[in-house]
Every structure is written in structure tokens, then in C-alpha cells.
């Protein structure tokens, strides 16, 4: 046995060094090519055949109907005409829900939020919700309450049996009320004088609300121009409609503007602002994340994507406590106003440098797949490397048998 190995190693071949050099060159070129394709793939610009192409999108909800990702409920605005609300189930079907008339009430749409079971909720009248389903069925739901208030935000915990809403009370103050099957609780006591804006479910009986708070007592502040800071609160409600929700934790943040409040689906909530972000956990802790952004979305895996200002060359992600920076092949061409996630796609709506309204999309399913340039090169490199090793091994074994 030892003799065979010695004779084999003593053999000289003019092709051995050539083969080794070619393989080393292939490895180096492959590494350079992989590094060159390290930017995010799946980025595209343009609304395609969507009806909102060229219009400013104020609110939008994307539905996954299993056929066409373009299914959406859209609120657009045209300065020369007014507000429009319509649904689009495919590239050929656009159904109008609201068109501007002499008195345009479209600006009274305070929010449009996606619920479960292909539903969306909005509000345009006091103590009333409007439910719109994917099939364009519209239901006007009156909230059962002896008080009068406007609804600024509405969110559910797996259905209408447990829900929360941000309200503007008749006395002008901002508050939060719980609901169960559209019966409202008394309002939250707002001793901090917070102007609440949004709310989202955290876990069990806990919710996270965000807003702003005006501080006239800060050093250097003038009573005529007080400091406005972001506010984050954890709200608890045990399900008793005769009892108001309770503020159990409160944090005053920076002077930045909160633009997104996102549930990650694992008993955590991400608060995204233009000066940074916060991670709110079920145990009541609120941790700061140093990622400023213009807009943000959370995907189906619980990963949050932070989208920067126009001209930014990267997109930051946060998942399981880890921050990653994903480089873009080109800078972000839009000043993003709103963004949404549905079925692996991130939809970003905003305005370009010429003042035209556009849409940018990012297909998150392409990353590290065979469709991604880097994924393809990785696959090709591993395939060729495996073939070379098999050929070399077969050659060694064949020659070993001959000696």
C-alpha cells in the first residue's frame, strides 16, 4: 500500500500545476464576482399597471388573494381633483369606493388598517368604523358608547372581540379606549397630556401606543415654542368593558417623528422614527435601536426593514436583536412617504427628485436564492467545485489502482 502511494506521488505531470493554477484563478474570480453582487437584488421602480401610478398615495392596504399581489385598497390624492378611495383586485379590475364631489370628505379618512380575514378598517365619522373586505363589501359599524369621539386609529387582537382605538374626545383631549364587539370602554386617563396617534397589539392583554408630548418645562425652552417629543406607552386591559385601559409603562423619547408602529408577531413591537427606533418587549422593557429611518415595515418572519431618506445607499434590518446593513445597487430614488409589506414584497410609495409620485418595490424572497446574482454565483461555485473534486478524486483512485 505504501509503495503504491510513493510511486503515485513520484509521478510528474505537466498538467498538474496548470490544473491547480486554473482552479486557484477560478476561486479568486468567483470571490470577486460574489463580492460584486453583494447588493440587494429584487429592487424595481414603477407601479406597473396599478391604478395609483403617478398619484400620491396617502393610505394603502395590500391583500394576498392568492392570485395577484396587486390586490389593494388605496387612498390617493390629486391636488386638482381631490381624494379617491378604490379597490383593485387585479390589473383589469378597479372599483371606485369614493370620488370627490363638491364637498370632498376624503381628507377625513384618518387611517386605513389591515385586519384579519382580508378586511380593512377606516373611520370618517365620529363613533363609527367602516369595514371594507377584499370583495368590496362595505359595512358601517357604529361604536356602542354614550360618549361622542372621533377615532384616530383602530387595531384588533385576532378579531373584534378584543380591540383598541385611539380617540379624540369631545373635550379635545386624546385618549385610548378598549372595545369588544364594537362596545367601547371608558377612556384612558391621560394625566401626561399625550397626544396619542397609533396603537398596536403587543401580547395577551398588552398594547403599545405612540404619540407626542409637549414639554414647556425643559431648560432653554420658550413657552411660545415648547419642545415636542415622541411618547411611547404600554397599555393593559383585562377585558372588562366597565373599566378603562391602564397605562403601565411610559417613555418620553427624542424630538424626532414616529412614522411606523409595527408588531413583529413574537410579543415585540418596533417603534420607528426619523431619529432612531425602539424595541418594546412583553416584559415592559423599551430598548433604543440606533437606526434612523424614513419609513419601515416588518415582514412575515418578524424582520423589520428600515428605509432611509432619498439618496441612501443601504437598507438596515433588525431581527432577533441583530442589525444588518443591506447595500443597494443604486441609491433610493424616492422620498418615501408610506411603505407596506405583503407576501414577500415591500411596497414603497413616495416622490422622486422631479416631484413625480412613484413606487419602488423590493422582493425579499429573492435574497440568497438562485434568482439573486450572489445566490447564483454561490450555487455555480459550489457546483463546479464539487465536480472538480469528484474528477480529481476519481483520477487519484484510478491511478492508485494501476500501481
What are these regions (language model features)?
Residues 36-56:
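A short helix->beta-strand "capping" segment at the edge of beta-propeller domains
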Residues 54-64, 104-114, 143-160, 192-204, ...:
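Repeated scaffold domains used in trafficking and secretory/extracellular systems
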Residues 252-317:
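Membrane-proximal low-complexity regions enriched in glycine and acidic/polar residues
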Residues 58-78, 110-114, 119-124, 130, ...:
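Short beta-strand elements that form the blades of beta-propeller/WD-repeat-like
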Residues 76, 212-229, 365:
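Short, conserved, GDST-rich strand-edge loop motifs in beta-rich repeat architectures
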Residues 333-384, 397-402:
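Blade-level signature of beta-propeller repeat domains, shared across WD40, Kelch, NHL, RCC1
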Residues 82-100, 128-144, 166-191, 227-246, ...:
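Surface-exposed loop/turn elements that mediate protein-protein interactions on large endomembrane-trafficking
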Amino acid at each position: 500500500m505504501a509503495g503504491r502511494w510513493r510511486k503515485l506521488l513520484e509521478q510528474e505531470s505537466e498538467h498538474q500545476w496548470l490544473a491547480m493554477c486554473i482552479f486557484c484563478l477560478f476561486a479568486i474570480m468567483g470571490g470577486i464576482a460574489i463580492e460584486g453582487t453583494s447588493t440587494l437584488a429584487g429592487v424595481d421602480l414603477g407601479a406597473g399597471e396599478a391604478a395609483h401610478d403617478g398619484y400620491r398615495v396617502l393610505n394603502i392596504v395590500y391583500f394576498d388573494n392568492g392570485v395577484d399581489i396587486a390586490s389593494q385598497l388605496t387612498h390617493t390624492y390629486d391636488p386638482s381633483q381631490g381624494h379617491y378611495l378604490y379597490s383593485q383586485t387585479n390589473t383589469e379590475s378597479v372599483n371606485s369606493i369614493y370620488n370627490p364631489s363638491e364637498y370632498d370628505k376624503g381628507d377625513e379618512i384618518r387611517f386605513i388598517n389591515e385586519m384579519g380575514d382580508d378586511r380593512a378598517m377606516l373611520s370618517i365619522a365620529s363613533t363609527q368604523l367602516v369595514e371594507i373586505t377584499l370583495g368590496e363589501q362595505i359595512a358601517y359599524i357604529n361604536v356602542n358608547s354614550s360618549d361622542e369621539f372621533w377615532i384616530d386609529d383602530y387595531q384588533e387582537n385576532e378579531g373584534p372581540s378584543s380591540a383598541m382605538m385611539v380617540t379624540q374626545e369631545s373635550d379635545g383631549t386624546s385618549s385610548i379606549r378598549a372595545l369588544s364587539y364594537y362596545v367601547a370602554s371608558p377612556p384612558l386617563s391621560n394625566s401626561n397630556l399625550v397626544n396619542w396617534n397609533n396603537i398596536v397589539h403587543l401580547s395577551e392583554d398588552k398594547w403599545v401606543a405612540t404619540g407626542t408630548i409637549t414639554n414647556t418645562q425643559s431648560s432653554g425652552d420658550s413657552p411660545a415654542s415648547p419642545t415636542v417629543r415622541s411618547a411611547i406607552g404600554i397599555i393593559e386591559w383585562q377585558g372588562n368593558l366597565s373599566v378603562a385601559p391602564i397605562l403601565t409603562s411610559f417613555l418620553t423619547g427624542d424630538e424626532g417623528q414616529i412614522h411606523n408602529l409595527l408588531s413583529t408577531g413574537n410579543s415585540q413591537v418596533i417603534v420607528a422614527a426619523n431619529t432612531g427606533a425602539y424595541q418594546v418587549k412583553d416584559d415592559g422593557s423599551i430598548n433604543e435601536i440606533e437606526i434612523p429611518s424614513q419609513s419601515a415595515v416588518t415582514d412575515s418572519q418578524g424582520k423589520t426593514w428600515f428605509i432611509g431618506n432619498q439618496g441612501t445607499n443601504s437598507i438596515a434590518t433588525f431581527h432577533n436583536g441583530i442589525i444588518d446593513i443591506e447595500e443597494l445597487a443604486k441609491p433610493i430614488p424616492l422620498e418615501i412617504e408610506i411603505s407596506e409589506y405583503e407576501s414577500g414584497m415591500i411596497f414603497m410609495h413616495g416622490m422622486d427628485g422631479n416631484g413625480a409620485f412613484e413606487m419602488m418595490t423590493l422582493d425579499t424572497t429573492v435574497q440568497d436564492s438562485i434568482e439573486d446574482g450572489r445566490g447564483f454565483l454561490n450555487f455555480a461555485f459550489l457546483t463546479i467545485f464539487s465536480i472538480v473534486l469528484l474528477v480529481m478524486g476519481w483520477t487519484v483512485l484510478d491511478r492508485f489502482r494501476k500501481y
